[in-house]
Each structure stands twice: as C-alpha cells, then as structure tokens.
C-alpha cells in the first residue's frame, strides 16, 4: 500500500483511502468541484476533484475509495489532484490500514496509569479513580483506544490514554518540584481530566463530534460524570469534591479556550499548564512529521499562531 506519509510532490497515485470528508465547492470561475479529506493510518491529505467528469464515480464521506491522481503542493503541504474515483469493494482493503494509532504500547501505558492509582494515598481520590478506570470495564476499554481529538493533537487510536498519562507524568514532576502541590489531587485529576472525550467523540473510523459533544462538550460532560461517581462514594468530603470538579472545569485555563472556570487552585493552575504543554508538544511533533525533508520552516500554524522549525542540534 502507498501510505500518505510516503507521498511526495509529483507522485502519481492509484490507491484506496478512507474519505473522511467530502465538501462541494464552486470556483471563482463558477465551476463545481469537490474538496476531500483522505486518510490512512499514517495521516491525512487534502484532495481536490476539479473536473466532475464520468471518471468520478458516486461516493460519500466515510466510504473507502480508489483514487487516481497526482500529488501537488499547496501552501507548503501535499495535496492530491484527483482525476478518477470509484468506491472500493469489500475485500479490496484492510480497515487496519486506515486507522491511525499511537506508536506506544496501549496495554503498557494502561499499566502505568494503574500504577499511579495504586500509589495514591488519599482513599477518596483512589476510590474515585478505581471507579473510573477499573470498575467500569466498558469505559476503561473505550478509554484505552479512544482518540484525544478530532484532528488537533493525539487524534488517533490510543491518543486519549497517551495524552492523559503524559499530563499525569508532567503533574507528578510538578508535585515533586513544588511541595505545595497535593500530588494525589493533581495526578488523579490529570488522569481523568479528559474522560468526557469518550462520549464527546465517536469511535474510529468516524472520530467526529457526537451531538452531545457539540452541545455540551467534554469538560462539562466529564464534570457531570465525576459528580455522579463522587456521590456514590460514602463520606466523600464536600470540599474535596468541589476541588476535584474545579480542576476538571478549569483545565483549559482560560474562558476563551473553553474552560467554564478559570483556575482558582494551585493544582488547577498546574494541571492546565501541563495539559497545554503536552498538547503543544504533540501538535509540534505531528507538524514536523508531515514536513517535507527539504523544508526547513513550516507554513503558518494556526494552532501555534506562528511558523515553526526544528532546532539545529
């Protein structure tokens, strides 16, 4: 199979890809065309069908399609100029080739998560973590393979677990550096800070926002679930319950970034910084992975609000 990550400008392509999105458009000359997003397990590529001829068969978004065309460059990124399309038939493709996945061992990461829970001394936080990640086996199974985003960072199978574990590790290092931070509170809140994404985003291959995800969002969805689980634990201290929910509600840091509350606890401040750091590190890494070998600087990156390049050493 010719993977998207291996495509270069000028390449002729005849391959089956998953059509994630299909949008009709009209050029400035009044001609109709299609904009597509094509995906395999190595990434995505923008596709353009400029000529809607008989060579373009009927297909819809989320179909597997055989495309023929040429790779061009547009604003520093690869784009596929498509001349022919037909819907792929069963047996012509293996779905595993089209599901992007973490490079890390999922079971190994989940064992690390469980080890963090076992180290927790606060009985209420430990019980809450066990309810989420151990007792609710359906949730745990989904959490392990879910993505953390539709497209921004960790948008692949195992991405949610990878991101949550990384944020928890950063928070653990913060707690070691700053003794005024409560380790149990910040690390446990890091592990479950994005738990709402299991319901906010649908599973692969769609990996798109659900109706509840669009209307409510993962932060509020996670806080609602936390509140319900906390009420099931006898004697859970009300102040601690509020602190747990606050860390969830404030983990995006700023109101304009989607947080219903700004951080008002040390642990909430540190968690929001750790979350932002890991997201930006992964975003940077994913951009660099897609960068052409002969390209030093990237194009303007809206998510980072600047152009970027790798360091020289």
Locate each region found by the language model.
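Short, acidic/hydrophobic/Gly-rich beta-strand patch recurrent on exposed beta strands
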Residues: 35-40, 203
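OB-fold nucleic-acid-binding modules
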Residues: 1-13
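Divalent metal-dependent catalytic cores for phosphoryl transfer on phosphate-bearing substrates
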Residues: 151-153, 162, 173-291
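Divalent metal-coordination and catalytic microenvironments
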Residues: 17, 62, 167, 248, ...
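OB-fold single-stranded nucleic acid-binding module
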Residues: 22-32, 43-97
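Acidic/His-rich, divalent-metal-binding segments that scaffold phosphate/diphosphate chemistry
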Residues: 92-214, 254
